[in-house]
Amino acid sequence: MDVNPTLLFLKVPAQNAISTTFPYTGDPPYSHGTGTGYTMDTVNRTHQYSEKGKWATNTETGAPQLNPIDGPLPEDNEPSGYAQTDCVLEAMAFLEESHPGIFENSCLETMEVVQQTRVDKLTQGRQTYDWTLNRNQPAATALANTIEVFRSNGLTANESGRLIDFLKDVMESMDKEEMEITTHFQRKRRVRDNMTKKMVTQRTIGKKKQRLNKRSYLIRALTLNTMTKDAERGKLKRRAIATPGMQIRGFVYFVETLARSICEKLEQSGLPVGGNEKKAKLANVVRKMMTNSQDTELSFTITGDNTKWNENQNPRMFLAMITYITRNQPEWFRNVLSIAPIMFSNKMARLGKGYMFESKSMKLRTQIPAEMLANIDLKYFNESTRKKIEKIRPLLIDGTASLSPGMMMGMFNMLSTVLGVSILNLGQKRYTKTTYWWDGLQSSDDFALIVNAPNHEGIQAGVDRFYRTCKLVGINMSKKKSYINRTGTFEFTSFFYRYGFVANFSMELPSFGVSGINESADMSIGVTVIKNNMINNDLGPATAQMALQLFIKDYRYTYRCHRGDTQIQTRRSFELKKLWEQTRSKAGLLVSDGGPNLYNIRNLHIPEVCLKWELMDEDYQGRLCNPLNPFVSHKEIESVNNAVVMPAHGPAKSMEYDAVATTHSWIPKRNRSILNTSQRGILEDEQMYQKCCNLFEKFFPSSSYRRPVGISSMVEAMVSRARIDARIDFESGRIKKEEFAEIMKICSTIEELRRQK
């Protein structure tokens, strides 16, 4: 019998059918090759939006800079960055008037954070531009390198461990006439292999000292490295994103702390909350507008889109905002917060790797690094690239482009949200002084605008007024990409609203499945994803049960761990069958050891080991949870781990899952090919860093680990901790006198070695 698919929807309210429109099967697109072209696009576009501004030259670096602020008034329809300082300041003043004390309180909260934050805050985050090596590194390594260079140049305030003191060093480093850095390089030589008698290339890694004069150092300190944004769906063209270096990071962190504190107090802000909390916040604003539009008023909502939000924002505006927000605060605090926008007004964009050329006839490939773009003959390039390079040439210095206007992606999300909300705030009747009024939601560059008025003309007038007010602060609402609807149906940050937010379960589909970390983590993540979707995304019990069965099937195929009594033959089936036969309590075997699945939708919150513990044979328990098992490279697992899950839309999300350490929590070994490259020195530094941190955590289990106060080093802290613990253990009879004496002796030896060093 044929089924007419429309019958499926007869009983379903229209808004619930959204999950059937899922377009994102398959992998998202990734970028290959260099991001140089995309970065040049960004730089050129940003300058084009501000082209009527005034040019000036930076006295320290010699970089040409364009300043569009307080220049010509913006025009209708054309996106531009011509923000007017007095308009921004006025918007801030009205925001404060409607929220008395908001800036004052946020400043006090931030001041406390500034005084307490440790420098290790900067180790969070992925890739960071490492100015000492002039390329990207993991954040922790980049920070370690920066501090190492600072100390060897006599900058030692950072030793207190406070972030604010590290920032003092950053400020001082910019006044120095020169900075000495250590760079890694590699030498290649051809040598004859003794065994095979063939010629092979041998690489050796060296470190060499290099001096940077003030100008070169400043350029590096102000550089944002650029990469291509990966895995963006629904776009034909890729685009560039930026990673700032360690000099900028700390200052940005404090500014964003202040802005976050303000956003938390603004009902129209979609940041910093997320998920259900965000939905509740937004639903409140909509409810307010709908209740207030009594029978006499019309209410319309614009699902908004802004043209090139980042490229039209201007750091000088952010400086004005901060100056206003902190106007009654102590001088030191105002200075710390104004440095980030000042650095951004003088930023340089690194053009990335450059271009790759290949000659088909001569089978040659050659890389043109970004540094050479300033004076290479343009006849080698195609039309579009030639135009880009010609346009960007006046801005180039040492392979970086001077980029004063614009913000680069994702740098001041919170602060730009404050700016957006300040315009939404102006929609109250006491400010519009007419019959129309507006309110809305803002989350970084995404917005929804709700306009109420007695008639259609009023709605139109309200939208126009909002559009033009935005223009005055450098926000360009796109008339082409925004659409208007009766209030009750709109989209905001991929949440779809139709008489309430609709659960769009299909957006979570890509995060179902086996993650590929290890058997233990994958099982845990898989069931947690299903559990979370039952809680947050209307995943019904029947569908969840089906998802669970599909997941278990997927898991068994991935790890080739079909049940011990199955007929399926795989590489592992011989071993698993043997285990199955010699196990008394078969229900106790983990799924990854060929056991049965005991999960159902009621017990997804229990880790599998705990679920089956009582059912396990004793010797199986002993093998499974044995930290001394020599075949396991064990990582110590906190009771909660974080996994990165990929929804179809938006950024990768971090999700917590329960982790029980068993012999299945193995870590794959690192690829060996890295050991022969110039990365090797860096890798060794990184491993040492890791080892020190792990050792430190052994001495200070997280329960008792308070942030160190004062200036004792890690070694001193560990030695004194060891002595205290040993004394307690000795006095309570947990260790013998000989052991106690030995520990004390080791501690003294360590101190002696430190003194000699």
UniProtKB/Swiss-Prot annotation:
> Taxonomic lineage per UniProt?
Viruses, Riboviria, Orthornavirae, Negarnaviricota, Polyploviricotina
Looking at the record, the residues that make up the RdRp catalytic domain are 286-483
Q: Which gene encodes it?
A: PB1
Keywords attached to this Swiss-Prot or TrEMBL record, sorted alphabetically, are: Eukaryotic host gene expression shutoff by virus, Eukaryotic host transcription shutoff by virus, Host cytoplasm, Host gene expression shutoff by virus, Host nucleus, Host-virus interaction, Inhibition of host RNA polymerase II by virus, Nucleotide-binding, Nucleotidyltransferase, Phosphoprotein, RNA-directed RNA polymerase, Transferase, Viral RNA replication, Viral transcription
Question: Looking at the record, which segments are called Promoter-binding site?
Answer: 249-256
Compartments where located: Host nucleus; Host cytoplasm
Q: What is its EC number?
A: 2.7.7.48
Task: Output this protein's name.
Answer: RNA-directed RNA polymerase catalytic subunit
Give the UniProt family note: Belongs to the influenza viruses polymerase PB1 family.
Cellular component GO terms, alphabetically?
host cell cytoplasm; host cell nucleus
Q: What class of enzyme is it?
A: transferase
Organism listed in the record: Influenza A virus (strain A/Duck/Hokkaido/8/1980 H3N8)
This protein's superkingdom? Viruses
According to its UniProt entry, the protein's GO biological process terms are: DNA-templated transcription; symbiont-mediated suppression of host gene expression; symbiont-mediated suppression of host mRNA transcription via inhibition of RNA polymerase II activity; viral RNA genome replication; viral transcription
Primary localisation category: host cell
